[in-house]
Amino acid sequence: MTKPTPTIHSLRDLRRLTPARVGLGRSGASVPTKALLDFTLDHARARDAVHASFDGAALTGELSALGLAVHEVRSRVRGRHDYLVRPDLGRQLDPESRDRLAGIGGPGGDLVLVIGDGLSPGAVHARAAAVVGRLLKRLTEAGIAVGPAVVANGARVALGDEIGALLGARMVAVLIGERPGLSSPASLGAYLTYAPRPGLTDAERNCVSNIHPAGLSEDEAAFKIGWLIREALARRLSGVALKDDSMLEAATAARELSAPG
C-alpha cells in the first residue's frame, strides 16, 4: 500500500504528477489560450457533474450482485435545484422512506452502508460498487457484520446518521459523490460515523476523500476505509478522536514482509 516518493526537479516534473494547474505560463498579462480553454472546459465538466442524473435502480442491482440486501430511499429534496439551495433537506429522510426503514427494525449489524448521489452522481456510478466490493472482502476477513445497504437519492452526508440510527447499526459508512473540482469532476468520498444519530457534526466523522483515477485508487480507498471501520468499532469512537494511521500499519507490514528470514 506504500508508494515510492517521486523525485521532483522542476515544474515540468510536478505537472506530470498532478492534474492541478501548475506552471501555466503566461501570454501578456493573462494565461495562454490553451490554459484558458482548458479551464473553461473543466468548469463546464464540473457543472455537468453536479446536474447529472442518478440511477438508483442500476446501483441497487450492482450492490445486490455483491450479496447485499439493498433498500432505496430518498431525502426530502424534490429536485436538483432544491438539493443545491436547501442542503438541510438533503440531511433528512422523506416521511415514506423513514417509515419504511423504521419498519425493518432489528439490529443493523456492525455496519450499514449508505450510497448517495451527492454532488457528483457520476462518481458514484463509476466507483461506488467497485469500492464496496473490495471493502466487503476486508470487512469479512475482520469479522465485521455488515447489515443492509441503502441507496439514497438527494443525499447529503448527514443523511447517513438518520439511516444508521433507524436500522440500529453500530456504525454507518456513507459513500457519496464529492463536490466536483476543476481537475476532478467525478470524485467519490467516504464518511464514517460511529454510533450514528441525527444531530452529529462533521467533527464526529472520519473522511476518506479523492477516490478517483488521479487520486486514491479503489484498492487504496477500501484499505483505508476498512482500517478506519475496524478501529472505530474496536475503540467505540470516530471523528477527530480517531487518527488515520492506516498507512503506518501498511508500511510496517511491508517492512515485515521484506525482512530476511
Swiss-Prot record:
UniProt cofactor(s): adenosylcob(III)alamin
Catalytic activity reported: ethanolamine = acetaldehyde + NH4(+)
Domain of life, source organism: Bacteria
Enzyme class, first EC level, given as a word: lyase
Xref: Pfam families: EutC
Main location: other
Enzyme Commission (EC) number: 4.3.1.7
InterPro entries tied to this protein: EutC, EutC_C, EutC_N
Binding site for adenosylcob(III)alamin: V157, E178, C207
GO molecular function annotation: cobalamin binding; ethanolamine ammonia-lyase activity
Subcellular location: Bacterial microcompartment
Quaternary data: The basic unit is a heterodimer which dimerizes to form tetramers. The heterotetramers trimerize; 6 large subunits form a core ring with 6 small subunits projecting outwards.
Family membership: Belongs to the EutC family.
HAMAP family: EutC
This protein's name: Ethanolamine ammonia-lyase small subunit
Organism per entry: Rhodopseudomonas palustris (strain BisA53)
Lineage: Bacteria, Pseudomonadati, Pseudomonadota, Alphaproteobacteria, Hyphomicrobiales
